[in-house]
Amino acid sequence: MYVFPKISLRPEVENYLKESFLNEEAVSASSRQEAERKFETLLLRLSHPPSMTTVRVNTHLGSVQHVRGLLLEELQKQFGESSIPVVQHPALPDVLLIPMTGPRKNIERQQGEVIVGAQCGNAVLRGAHVYVPGIVSASKFMKAGDVISVYSDINGKCKKGAKEFDGTKVFLGNGISELSRKDIFNGLPDLKGIGIRMTEPIYLSPSFDNVLPSYIFLQNLPSTVVAHVLDPQPGEKILDMCAAPGGKTTHTAALMQDKGEVIALDKILTKVNKLKQNASLLGLHSIRAFCFDATKALKLDTTDGIEGGPPFLPESFDRIILDAPCSGMGQRPNMACTWTLKEVTSYQPLQRKLLHVAVQLLKPGGVLVYSTCTITLAENEEQVAWALRTFPCLQLQPQEPQIGGEGMVGAGLTLEQLKQLQRFDPSVVPLQNMDTDSLGEARREDMIWLANKDCIGFFIAKFLKCQSTKAKVSQK
């Protein structure tokens, strides 16, 4: 049973997605009824969090077993006697899985309320406490120490500082207020600490605020697959084109044993600074991060550019990650997306610009991994079909490990090509209802299967560059 409504989308966006998922190939492969059922299930799953919290171990500083032991100690501090398993993924040896319990349906709602923004609400559903910047409104007489019910303003309609809100709101659980209403709205403008400490969340997951920051990196499971598929080797020169906040960059450097060079680009300075901070925290020295627009990363003559930095000469890199800017429609939980159809469809041209640059920067024999955290056909399988048509030098490659499902039909790719893709589709598994008793009885294999299926929507394609493109690639 679903505890939240399906993701709220503008009608034109929902129709666009529906047409994509009910394309002629998809309907003929099963039936229209089955394709519709799968699409509606996907919309419901998107509003609920994944069943597992995934943490990647920084193997540069510690062994997986050592860090697993530290993590178990931390969970005991947070949950006391409740036994929460920490499972090592067999195909992703540096990844640990921690099951989430919930949804808990018998939580008593309190008279005092706090309304939080949708982004804050999504974080609460994955184990976070409520931080002051996320609080939009609070009950008139709320004091520090009060037990408060927390709600998410999924449509962004609540006014900052309101004393009550009757619009659409979704219950997230109860917590204890660390501050009074007056402290929050009339206090210092730069308050950033915890405002509500969640004690009875609908979904119970560990809080990772400042937990083992040099040893673990919170990352969605499909995102951890990307660097393994890339398979970087010590001594190579790697480019991560759209790198912030650095999960895939730092993973790549760790897999290379911090030997070689990982160049990370992002065009927003604050994000680049965060990436540098993460690399430093994880003790990685092979990463060089630059604030730079990756669409301009190809050097057109020998005079421009930062020394050792962008733009770069053609065919400079052994391997490239293009985790492309995308519509992000696979992120979970996400109860509402207010984007227009124009916004949702605006990413395909940008992704193609980036692919043009990536192909020219990659050495012959080099590997390009393209990924997105979205579910649209246009940004995933259609981009693969376009790339294969546009760049005869590219060959689609099988992926290792292969954890996601095969690609979606509808872009004109062959069945063999679809099998070489990875599409993570959360609609393939029913909503889980996990409590501490069922956790104790759960088999390790079942938890791993669930982690592989009940994750965010994501897509991965792997290409091999078979010949040089030193002659200019035509823009199509």
Swiss-Prot record:
Active site: 373
Record's catalysed reaction(s): cytidine(72) in tRNA(Thr) + S-adenosyl-L-methionine = 5-methylcytidine(72) in tRNA(Thr) + S-adenosyl-L-homocysteine + H(+); cytidine(72) in tRNA(Cys) + S-adenosyl-L-methionine = 5-methylcytidine(72) in tRNA(Cys) + S-adenosyl-L-homocysteine + H(+)
Main subcellular location of this protein, as a coarse class: cytoplasm
Keywords, comma-separated and alphabetical: Acetylation, Cytoplasm, Methyltransferase, RNA-binding, S-adenosyl-L-methionine, Transferase
GO molecular function: tRNA (cytidine-5-)-methyltransferase activity; tRNA binding
Sites of N6-acetyllysine modification: 419
All residue ranges annotated as the PUA domain in the record: 111-203
Pfam families according to UniProt: Methyltr_RsmB-F (PF01189)
Classification lineage: Eukaryota, Metazoa, Chordata, Craniata, Vertebrata
Source species: Mus musculus (Mouse)
Record flagged with keyword Cytoplasm: yes
Record keyword RNA-binding present: yes
Domain notes: The PUA domain plays a role in tRNA recognition through precisely recognizing the CCA end and the D-stem region of tRNA.
EC annotation from Swiss-Prot or TrEMBL: 2.1.1.-
The name this protein goes by in its record: tRNA (cytosine(72)-C(5))-methyltransferase NSUN6
Matching InterPro entries: MeTrfase_RsmB-F_NOP2_cat, MeTrfase_RsmB-F_NOP2_dom, PUA, PUA-like_sf, PUA_sf, RCMT, SAM-dependent_MTases_sf
